[in-house]
């Protein structure tokens, strides 16, 4: 559950905090592409691995991320992650708004789910919907689990208002180099 929260936080919370068990929903399957982050996508300002989606018409977006700072960046297994963000919300974000999240571990899709933006925004930042247009600055801290399998995770999050209005699309790639525990020399 904490890793799902991390995935949400790294891609969606910075966007939807204002608008409002990792392995609990497996959806294994092969993908034609492992890169959800395109080299032509626009990087979101700040200390973070996030970009706006390359194949997304940002002219129709109603949520603009001014910056996201992750502390530490990159995130570390078994440590706290603090997320600082400023978002410009250009439309009223309604109850029933949602984000579709896809997470790939290499070629394998391990998460493919729809989350309620308002529920998550309230859970993580005490933000209630509907959220009126404006600039919102927030900070949140989450605890990452130690047992994050090593490798590269590719995350894609597309968000829509309850009426189907496009909010935004964000992608990110994060690598973890170990499970978060140290090997102990048992020869002594």
Curated annotation (Swiss-Prot):
Cellular component annotations (GO), alphabetically ordered: fungal-type vacuole lumen
SMART domains named in the record: ML
Keyword Membrane appears in the UniProt entry: no
Superkingdom of origin: Eukaryota
GO biological process terms held by the UniProt record: intracellular sterol transport; membrane organization; sterol transport
Keywords of the record: Lipid transport, Signal, Transport
Molecular function per GO: sterol binding
The keyword DNA repair appears for this protein: no
Signal peptide: 1-19
Subunit structure as annotated in this protein's UniProt entry: Monomer.
Name recorded for this polypeptide: Phosphatidylglycerol/phosphatidylinositol transfer protein
Species the sequence originates in: Schizosaccharomyces pombe (strain 972 / ATCC 24843)
């Amino acid at each position: 559950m904490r890793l799902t929260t991390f995935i949400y936080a790294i891609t969606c919370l910075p966007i939807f905090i204002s608008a409002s068990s990792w392995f609990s929903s497996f959806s294994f399957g092969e993908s034609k592409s492992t890169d959800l982050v395109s080299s032509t996508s626009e990087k979101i300002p700040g200390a973070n691995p996030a970009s706006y989606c390359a194949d997304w018409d940002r002219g129709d977006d109603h949520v603009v991320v001014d910056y996201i700072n992750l502390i530490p960046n990159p995130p570390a297994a078994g440590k706290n992650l603090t997320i600082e963000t400023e978002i410009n919300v250009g439309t009223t974000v309604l109850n029933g708004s949602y984000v579709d999240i896809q997470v790939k571990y290499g070629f394998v899709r391990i998460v493919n789910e729809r989350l309620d933006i308002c529920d998550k925004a309230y859970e993580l930042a005490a933000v209630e919907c509907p959220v009126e247009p404006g600039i919102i600055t927030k900070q949140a801290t989450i605890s990452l689990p130690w047992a994050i399998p090593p490798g590269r995770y590719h995350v894609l999050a597309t968000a829509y208002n309850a009426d189907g209005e496009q909010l935004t699309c964000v992608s990110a790639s994060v690598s973890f180099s170990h499970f978060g525990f140290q090997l102990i020399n048992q020869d002594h």
